[in-house]
Each structure stands twice: as C-alpha cells, then as structure tokens.
Amino acid sequence: MLSTVFRRTMATGRHFIAVCQMTSDNDLEKNFQAAKNMIERAGEKKCEMVFLPECFDFIGLNKNEQIDLAMATDCEYMEKYRELARKHNIWLSLGGLHHKDPSDAAHPWNTHLIIDSDGVTRAEYNKLHLFDLEIPGKVRLMESEFSKAGTEMIPPVDTPIGRLGLSICYDVRFPELSLWNRKRGAQLLSFPSAFTLNTGLAHWETLLRARAIENQCYVVAAAQTGAHNPKRQSYGHSMVVDPWGAVVAQCSERVDMCFAEIDLSYVDTLREMQPVFSHRRSDLYTLHINEKSSETGGLKFARFNIPADHIFYSTPHSFVFVNLKPVTDGHVLVSPKRVVPRLTDLTDAETADLFIVAKKVQAMLEKHHNVTSTTICVQDGKDAGQTVPHVHIHILPRRAGDFGDNEIYQKLASHDKEPERKPRSNEQMAEEAVVYRNLM
C-alpha cells in the first residue's frame, strides 16, 4: 500500500533532503554523535530523507580493525539509528555499514541500508564492485582483503522522495548498474562514498554528473572528507546533481551538510523532452542482468498452471520447475514466463536469459547428482516432438550407458505418452523443488 501511495504522489512532488559529509574514524560513538547532530538538524528543517556516506559507522586504522569492528544490521548500535528515524519521522540512507557475515567474519559486506521513518529496513544493498589496486613500490589498496562483494542486484526502493537506486562509491564507475536501476524505474541514484583525494580531484564530479545525465535521474552522493587516520584521507564534496547534470547542492571539504529540493516533475519533463530511452537500439545491443526474481506465485506453462512450490528458480524473464514425468533423475524444465510456442517468438533479452538460466541450472544439477554430462534440448514445434506449445528447455543429467546408443531423443519424444510412466505426486515434486531451490 505504501509503495502505491508513493507512486501516486511522486509524479509532481517536491521533496526536501539532507546530505551529510563526515570524517569517520575508529571511534564509533563519536561518529554516531556527529551523524545524530546532522539528522536532528535535518529533522528541524523538515527534511523527508537524510543521506549518510559510506563508512558512516567507522573507518578503521588497519585491515584487522575494519574486520573486528564490523556488526550486524540488527545490533544495538544500529538500533540507535532506527530510533533517530522514528523520533524525527525521517527516512535514512545509511551509505556503507561494515556488515558482519556470521559465516565469514573475516570478510564483512559493505552494505547500503534504507531505513524508513518507522525504523524498519526497506532495502539492503551489498556493494558489488570492490576496489583492488596494487602497483608494486607505489600503492596497495585491496578492498577485497577486508570486505566481500555482493552477489545480487537490488531493485530501486520506493521512498517518500521517489524511487531510489542503490549503489556505493566505486560502483559509480560501472554505468551498467545505474542503467539497470534506471530501467527498473529509478528516479534518483545514490552513491554514498569515501573517494580518495587523488581520484576525487580528477573524477568525482564528472562521474556523478555523467550518471545523472545519461540516466535522467537525480544523483545524491554523500561523502567522507578529510583525514580519518595517518594513512587515509577522503575528498569530500558531497553533492546533489539534477537530471540535467547541474550541481544543485554541494559541500566543500569540511564536515558539513547540504540540502536540496527534489522535483520529480522535472524528471518527467526532461524524459519527455529527450526520450533517449525510447531511442535505444535494443535490436543491436542490450544489457543483460543475471537477476533473480522475487516473484513467489505460480506461473502458466501454456494452458497448465505450475504451482509455486514446483518452481525452484526464476528471473524477470524465465522460470525453472521440476518435471511431472522425468525421463532421468534430475530432469527439469526451463521456460520463458511469457507464453510463446516457438523459440523464434522470444525477444533477444528473453532468449539470452533463457539459456543463461539453463547453464546455471545445469551446473547445479551436475554437482548435486554427481554427473559430468547433460543433455540440453529444445523441441521447437510439433514436428520436433513438442507436446506443450510453450517454449521450454529440457535439462537431463546423464549417466554412462543410461540410454544405450544415445536414444534419449526418442525417449523425450514419447515419454509423455507412455502409459507405464506414472506422473509423480505434488508432494514428491515439491520436495525435489525445495532441494534445488536451496542449491540455487
């Protein structure tokens, strides 16, 4: 309901935000007090959302301290931020928490949290791109030694100020992530950061303005500034860029705040004036994202309904489900969500996704069933043996000598018609799907 209300009011809405610039160090309480003062000031100014930079919690003296001070998202320290959100009726973008992974404490995630005015987490994004640089005798900065890369894309989140795409710092150099967020409906892009002094001087504003212009989005970039310890210094210059590429708010190089008005009707106007996304040549190039779907309901397979508990993996374009009458142990089907009979009916994006998903499922099945061979087959049309007029890929793990002189194709063409091959029960199929779902 909340998301629906936002979408109805965002189109012409104007919203006031605060962007915070900090100099975090290894004193967590001092960092919190600095953030608290800024959040309180934003509350007094009736801001709807406050943006804090990457490493708002702390910046350690060394790799070991970065690891040792990491915390859970529901710890006592984070509860203080949730209480501030509730107290001031304000949303928080907490740009980069050192988020401890219980299964791998030596490599925390760098997590961007969105907390609503009730203190509830609305989104968690783990930084995808880690900055690793080693030039012998000159510089060594290996983020992967004390942090772990995220493994999934997080769709833009509905907030009171608009639909917000989440990124962190180094992610700004990878335009595909911003493009994906824009295509998923983002009106704003956020880049909480701790840019180094040299790269900040050269690229900070240029990168932020580029992401704003090419995606026709507001860009909000809260930043660290100044000397955190004798070994580390950040550039500062937190800023807000409008979708035309104009810097509409900016801090200098000290601990400070800047404020900006987000006018979502301006986003709509610019996109109407320059409809660049409708001019993209998707017939020549495309952006494929390996994205899992959060959809949990059943789906159509031609005229048949596939129950949700028989589906073990899905993306925005494809889904994978267990077989009613498997030819081999582990025989599953991959199908596009859109009901079309022929492979040639699929878009390029659907085709790419279908076969990428098939490859992932094949790898999982081979490992689980301890086999090294797989038959992957599309029966494209009635004369090719297709009995259900909906494109689907058969994935069949193979064992040595299982079908004599490789008679698998004859078996596939007739297995639905064999009276001795009894359909499995819903319970059997659901149990198998649970196993595969966990493995995927």
Curated annotation (Swiss-Prot):
Tell whether Nucleotide-binding is among the UniProt keywords: yes
Q: Which CDD domains match?
A: FHIT (cd01275), nit (cd07572)
Organism field? Caenorhabditis elegans
Motif residue range(s): Histidine triad motif: 390-394
Entry's Gene Ontology molecular function annotations:
bis(5'-adenosyl)-triphosphatase activity; deaminated glutathione amidase activity; nucleotide binding
Q: Which Gene3D superfamilies match?
A: Carbon-nitrogen hydrolase, HIT-like
Superkingdom as given in the UniProt entry = Eukaryota
Q: Which InterPro entries does the UniProt record give?
A: C-N_Hydrolase, C-N_Hydrolase_sf, FHIT, Histidine_triad_CS, HIT-like, HIT-like_sf, Nit1/2_C-N_Hydrolase, UPF0012_CS
Catalyzes what?
Answer: P(1),P(3)-bis(5'-adenosyl) triphosphate + H2O = AMP + ADP + 2 H(+)
Keyword Transcription, does the record have it? no
Q: Which cofactor does it need?
A: Mn(2+)
Any Pfam family hit: CN_hydrolase
Family matches, as SUPFAM superfamilies: Carbon-nitrogen hydrolase (SSF56317), HIT-like (SSF54197)
Q: What class of enzyme is it?
A: hydrolase
What family is it from?
Answer: In the N-terminal section; belongs to the UPF0012 family.
HIT domain: residues covered? 297-405
Q: Spell out the catalytic residues.
A: 54, 127, 169, 392
Q: What is the lineage of its organism?
A: Eukaryota, Metazoa, Ecdysozoa, Nematoda, Chromadorea
Oligomeric state and partners?
Homotetramer.
Question: What residue stretches are annotated with the CN hydrolase domain?
Answer: 14-264
Q: What is its EC number?
A: 3.6.1.29, 3.5.-.-
- Swiss-Prot/TrEMBL GO biological process terms: amide catabolic process; nucleobase-containing compound metabolic process
Please report the name of this protein according to its UniProt entry.
Nitrilase and fragile histidine triad fusion protein NitFhit
Q: What does this protein do?
A: Cleaves A-5'-PPP-5'A to yield AMP and ADP.
Q: Any idea which UniProt keywords this protein has?
A: Hydrolase, Multifunctional enzyme, Nucleotide-binding
